[in-house]
Structure formats: structure tokens, C-alpha cells
Amino acid sequence: MTKGPVRLDVGVSYALPRTGLPSSVSFRKWVAAALKGRIREADLAVRVVDEKEGCSLNHHYRGKDYATNVLSFPAEMPQGLPKGVKMPLLGDLVICAPVVAREAAEQGKSLSAHYAHLTVHGTLHLLGWDHEDDKEADAMEQLEREILAELGIDDPYAGER
């Protein structure tokens, strides 16, 4: 665990009208909760997109012909940095607003809680967490539960198993 103050720069952009979407302050709070005790300095971008852009990105980067709720793009360290130099750029999150809204309604979750969950989930991917097998998924889901509980948000996986 990392102790001490955290320097966090979260840039948020919206590719559709902001009405009903979380504020940049909310996204920053959720990212900060996911990073708390794990990293001391981070720059990342969050882009909220429509279904067309979400589908295009998911097709281009994952070969899937549908929009997904969140995509994580970890930053790559540039070549030639001196040994030991760390770059604070963590990466980018792309969140597809129509998919998030549809899932929240289908799952009976508040829209804000679902955005918080997916922001935490995507941020953990930027930190290297994954869910390719059951053991990884269980560990990542437990960490998500703990982070969301600190934010006062109910277990997003309750009732799934």
C-alpha cells in the first residue's frame, strides 16, 4: 500500500450531451477511491461516449461488434526513459453512456452507482487487474466491493451468483 498524498489529474470529456451523466467531480472521486493506497501519482482520461463510438472502439480494439460498458486502455511507457523513472500517465477509460443506462435499468441499480462501479472496475484494469479466470475475477470483484463500500455503494455483484 502506498501512503501519503496522492496527486491525481483526471480529464473528463463527453461525446454526447451531459444531461443525466455524472460530473467530472464524480468521476474524479471514483477514480481516487480505486487508486487510494495503490498509487501516489496518476494522470488519466475518462471519455463518455455514445453507442456508435463505443461500438467502433470495441470493434477496433477487441474485434467485438457491439458497444460495451467500459473499455480500459493502459498507457505504455515510452522507449528510452532512464531506468527508475516512472511516468504518471495511467491510461484512458471509455464509458459508453447508453450501455451503462441500459444495464443499470436491467439490473435494478441506480445509474450513479453503476457509473461508480464501472469507473472503479476500469481503473483497476489500468492498474493491471483482470478477470480472465475465476480466481482473478473473484479477487478483482472483492476489491471492487471494498472500494465501493468505502464510497457507500452496495455490492454490485449481489444476487449474481
UniProtKB/Swiss-Prot annotation:
It is an enzyme of class 3 (hydrolase). Binds 1 zinc ion. Its cofactor is Zn(2+). Signal peptide: none annotated. One of its GO terms (molecular function) is RNA endonuclease activity. One of its GO terms (cellular component) is cytoplasm. GO terms for biological process: rRNA processing. Zn(2+) binds at residues 121, 125, 131. Pfam families: YbeY. Its EC number is 3.1.-.-. It is found in: Cytoplasm. Keywords: Cytoplasm, Endonuclease, Hydrolase, Metal-binding, Nuclease, Ribosome biogenesis, rRNA processing, Zinc. InterPro entries: MetalPrtase_cat_dom_sf_prd, YbeY, YbeY_CS. Single strand-specific metallo-endoribonuclease involved in late-stage 70S ribosome quality control and in maturation of the 3' terminus of the 16S rRNA. Belongs to the endoribonuclease YbeY family. This is Endoribonuclease YbeY. It comes from Xanthomonas campestris pv. campestris (strain ATCC 33913 / DSM 3586 / NCPPB 528 / LMG 568 / P 25).
